[in-house]
Every structure is written in structure tokens, then in C-alpha cells.
């Protein structure tokens, strides 16, 4: 992975951890699988503790921290509560792909 992408991943991880009580942060998609192209965005899945605030509100909090860094990153971010992630990772779902093929950036 090149230095710019690693820098972006570090910034994303730092912003997520400042904004929300993440249990885990996964990188998935083309960057995780080593197949990015010029159209690729960074795909992130954030696992949150059960009982945390509304996911839409937390998503906004994370984006606010990224904006404070004055950095524009082409990012596709998904958030899910721990119990939902753990239940869905056993079926034919995005969570299964993330759990099986994703790269853990934080947690677990």
C-alpha cells in the first residue's frame, strides 16, 4: 500500500477513534484486496458497541473530525452495532465479506 493511502488510513482511524467508541475498524474492498484502481475509494466498516447513539449521528461526528483535519478523502464508510455485525457476519452479507476478507485497522 502506498504512503498516501497509509496516511489517509491513519487519519481515518484517528478521526473515528476521536469521534466514536469504536470496537473495531475494518478496511475492505479494493484497497484491502490489493486491487485498487484510479476510481477506487477507501471502504471502511466501523463496529460500534451496542447501545451507542444513532448511527447517522455518529457518522456525522466522524465526518466532522475528518473535516477539521482539512483533508478530503474519497471514503465509503459503513457503521454497525456489534451485535448486528456479529449476527450478520454468518450470512451472505457485507458483514461476512468484511469479517472474512477485511483488514483490521483497529480492535479485536
Residues covered by each model-derived region:
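Catalytic core of pol beta-like nucleotidyltransferases
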Residues: 1-24, 33-38, 49-108
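Glycine-rich beta-strand-to-loop/alpha-helix junction loops that act as flexible
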Residues: 28-30
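Short beta-strand->loop micro-motif that forms the acidic, two-metal-ion catalytic signature
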Residues: 42-47
